[in-house]
Amino acid sequence: MSVGKSSLKRAPGEAPGPSFDLTRFMPYRLAVLADDVSATIAQVYVDRFDLTRDQWRILAWLGNHAEMQAKEVGRNAGLDKMQMSRALARLDEKKLVAIKPDAQDRRGNILQLTKQGRALYDKITPLVTAREDYLLAALTPDEAAALDTIIAKLRRQALTLKAHG
């Protein structure tokens, strides 16, 4: 019996056909790993600094740029318009990000860290990179380099598949 819709229709007591082991399915394993890694990193900025993941991503992008277009930050951070809007509103309330109209695009905004935002970014960055270092310490230097290569290859392949449906 092939795996598919027909395999879902079995007589009572009939043994299942070939099984699909979700725990061995690479996308599932990557998602679980990403959740675990993100949760350990998030402990720093959520618990200690009352930031959400989306807020941290915005701060992290702005931390490496003097200023950026809001839509570019959102695209780079993987945030949709609603996520970006909510996170920016809170960062603005906390006076961590300055928002000004984009002179080139009247519909857009330019973002930059405030002094408080820069100070917070400077506090958080060494803490999250220390956690990253701890996680990567489980790998040899060759394994870490291979992981970077594998991630890049899988990302390119996924984007190609996504583009072609």
Question: Where are the regions that the model predicts?
Answer:
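Positions in alpha-helical segments
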Residues: Y28, R57, A130-Y134
